[in-house]
Amino acid sequence: MPPMAGLFWLLAAFVAYVYIGYPLALHLCRRLWPRPLAPRGRAAGTPGVSIIIAARNEGAQLARRIDNLLNLDYPADKRQIIIVSDGSTDNSLDVVAQYGPTVESVALPVGGKARALNAGVDRARHDLLVFADARQAFATDALRALVAPFSDPDVGAVSGELVLEGETRDRRMRISDRRRPGAPAVAPDVERRSTDRRLAAESTVVEGVGLYWRYEKQIRRDESAIGSTMGATGAVYAMRHSLWRRLPDETILDDVLAPMRCVLAGFRVVFEDRARAFDRAARDAKTESLRKRRTLAGNYQLLWLEPALLLPWRNPAWIQFVSHKVARLAVPYALPPLWLLSLVLSGRSLVYAAAFVAQCLFYLFAGYGAWLEKHDARAARDPWARPSAAVPDRLARVALMVLVMNASAVAGLAAILTRQKVWR
């Protein structure tokens, strides 16, 4: 086989493994060699939990978030709530003070999320640490579901599930219910058109993010079923206090570093989809790109904050870690030479020509997805502009999401190399 052809097939196999082969292999392993929790791991229980939230200038939503935590189905005497203010200049501390001794506060100068979490753990008095964000809300039974797997002594950390509220039907119902009291009634067809226009402005990226997130969650479920998932959901995860190690101040992904340290210590990190937190998907490609840049920059950072993760004799989940976290970082650098090689080789075989055409179609679909995003934003103003649910449009939105993710990986590396600040 000529060298160029060999390189083409090597790159094609690599990209296919990352996005298709690894998820399929995981699912097969789950079927053949599942590793269920010990039977007592599903037993009901209410161990003491310390809930820690690092917040900066979140005063506008802190009251709603604290109320959500106080209304969870969990005994008040087994629950400690700690809000760490990372240099807030708004009324965040005043909001927390209104709750008296029920909610504890820690005021720090600006130092970053990792330092704030370390300070919160220093105040924690219970055996289980629960980490959450100020923006998302927990389901009423989230805490009970999150702590249940810890009755299996092999479990060191548990990740909950982040539910993205981007479904058009559900959002239409919520928007329709948000009319101001006393406002005049609106004709159903007028209200429906108005609602559809607002939903249109959000549909392109929301749909792409939603599809990607469902794909990602299935990978996490399968990883968890055979051993450990690679990290946790930052909005809702828990770990044993005894396994906590202080985070370096510059840490970007506490929700990956802390759980993976549990894996290195010989414990499992499991995914519990009954422990749900709710959030909104990004409303445009720029916002989603910034989120992914932060996440992927954090994945690069992991490699030198905890280099033992790259050592197969130290990391019992080495194959999963390399396949899920490391290989994805390399995909953006495989795509350009793969396209160029298929172009050069396209005259030699229909296989290479088909590969070249397929890649061109992918990039064209991604470009069309970017156009759809602008079109959908215009639909919020133009009653004649309508978002399409046609299959080509859905494929375009997915292609745009994949392209955004890979571009964000490159931007994430640039952010790390230039020491840009990616957590605010």
Language model region names:
Residues 50, 68, 75, 85-93, ...:
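A conserved acidic beta->alpha catalytic loop
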Residues 43, 279, 328-420:
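Membrane-embedded multi-pass helical conduit in multi-pass membrane proteins
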Residues 76-82, 93-123, 161, 207-214, ...:
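Conserved donor nucleotide-binding strand/loop of the catalytic core
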Residues 60-64, 78, 89-98, 141:
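Acidic helix N-cap motif at the loop->helix transition within catalytic regions
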Residues 150, 154-167, 202-216, 249-254, ...:
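Catalytic donor/gating beta->alpha subdomain of glycosyltransferases that bind UDP-sugars
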Residues 1-42, 363-366:
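N-terminal membrane-anchoring/stem segments of glycan-assembly enzymes
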Residues 18, 109, 115-116, 140-171, ...:
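Long helical/loop segments within the catalytic core of UDP-sugar-dependent glycosyltransferases
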Residues 129:
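Short aromatic/hydrophobic "clamp" motif used to bind/position activated sugar donors
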